[in-house]
């Protein structure tokens, strides 16, 4: 987004929390939004608009609120749980910011500009087939045609893509819960939190305790530690033991994610003194945003996929970039409920 758009979005988000004239002025639009969303779901549920079923069970991961609630780390954790259960999952995603319209695979040679930052991160972390496309049905069919061994699809950020028939919806909330309870633009909700569906719904809280009245499970999020960018690109794991040089003085921490404050708080729990440097979600890194004198900076994995090592060496040879991978620990009760809700692979 442009600077003007960023400032407008920030002002609207403040109005969600503070109320006042702006939030009241946006309420009529929110009521129209609620009517449109409700009507759209009703048209799909009654069969007036057709849903498309794929040849394998489908798990959709999404959230009811705008902004980062933890969908991507949830998707990665679900994929890992499916693999441990003997399933062979694949991932489909829209590919935020992608320049292409057609369904296409994500590979180690893909760029964030061509497929989106989150799909590229998921491919690197999960090492399973990942396809992106605005049409999730087309992306899913293309993935299954290219990888017939896949027996379950996980759709990242597809909760509102209703044409894709799903067996399970995993709805992710963070500490914000439903916010002020209003739909966009008067509040953060994309749709009512109790929107009806024919799929099995499982609520997962990316928080220490439930943040809505909906029953669900609480995941534990934690940082794995730190790893230098060059080693991260080569597949090295993060080390929990912090580099001594980062403990001596405050270090710059940067995050282009939906809720950067959450990342900064997690770094502090590791014992680091940080100087927060928040960036807009999906920041493109057309230029390096940090002060010229910066020697060390800690970033998220979502940002790291947009920082080729060769570029950093050419533009800022004295800068060391550290990556802090985020891990999600899913409760056993959630995994058991998810696996029990999945049917076996359907015949083609």
From Swiss-Prot:
Q: Looking at the keywords, is ATP-binding present? A: yes
Gene Ontology cellular-component terms for this entry are: plasma membrane
InterPro entries named among the record's database cross-references: LpxK, P-loop_NTPase
Which catalytic reaction applies to this protein? a lipid A disaccharide + ATP = a lipid IVA + ADP + H(+)
By what name is this protein known? Tetraacyldisaccharide 4'-kinase
Q: What class of enzyme is it?
A: transferase
Q: Does the keyword Ribosomal protein apply?
A: no
Give the gene that encodes this protein: lpxK
Q: Which GO terms describe its molecular function?
A: ATP binding; tetraacyldisaccharide 4'-kinase activity
Q: Which organism is it from?
A: Leptothrix cholodnii (strain ATCC 51168 / LMG 8142 / SP-6) (Leptothrix discophora (strain SP-6))
């Amino acid at each position: 987004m442009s600077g003007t758009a960023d400032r407008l979005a920030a002002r609207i988000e403040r109005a969600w929390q503070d109320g006042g004239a702006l939030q009241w002025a946006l309420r009529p639009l929110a009521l129209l939004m609620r009517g449109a969303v409700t009507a759209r779901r009703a048209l799909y549920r009654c069969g007036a608009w057709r849903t498309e079923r794929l040849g394998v069970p489908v798990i959709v991961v999404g959230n009811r609120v705008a902004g980062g609630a933890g969908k991507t780390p949830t998707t990665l954790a679900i994929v890992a749980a499916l693999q441990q259960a003997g399933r062979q999952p694949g991932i489909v995603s829209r590919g935020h910011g992608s320049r292409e319209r057609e369904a296409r695979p994500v590979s180690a040679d893909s760029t964030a500009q061509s497929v989106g930052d989150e799909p590229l991160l998921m491919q690197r972390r999960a090492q399973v087939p990942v396809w992106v496309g605005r049409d999730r049905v087309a992306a899913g069919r293309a993935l299954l045609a290219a990888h017939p061994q896949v027996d379950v699809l996980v759709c990242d950020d597809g909760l509102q893509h209703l044409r894709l028939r799903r067996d399970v919806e995993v709805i992710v909330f963070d500490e914000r819960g439903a916010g002020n309870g209003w739909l966009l633009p008067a509040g953060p909700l994309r749709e009512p939190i109790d929107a009806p569906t024919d799929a099995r719904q499982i609520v997962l809280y990316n928080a220490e305790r439930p943040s809505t009245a909906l029953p669900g499970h609480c995941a534990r999020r934690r940082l794995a530690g730190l790893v230098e960018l060059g080693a991260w690109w080569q597949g090295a794991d993060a080390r929990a033991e912090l580099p001594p040089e980062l403990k001596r003085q405050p270090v710059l921490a940067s995050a282009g994610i939906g809720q950067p404050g959450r990342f900064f708080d997690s770094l502090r729990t590791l014992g680091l003194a940080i100087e927060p440097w928040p960036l807009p979600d999906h920041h493109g890194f057309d230029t390096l945003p940090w002060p010229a004198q910066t020697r060390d900076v800690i970033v998220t994995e979502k940002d790291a996929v947009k920082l080729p090592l060769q570029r950093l060496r050419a533009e800022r040879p004295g800068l060391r970039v550290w990556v802090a991978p985020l891990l999600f620990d899913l409760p056993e009760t959630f995994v058991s409920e998810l696996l029990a809700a999945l049917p076996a692979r359907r015949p083609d």
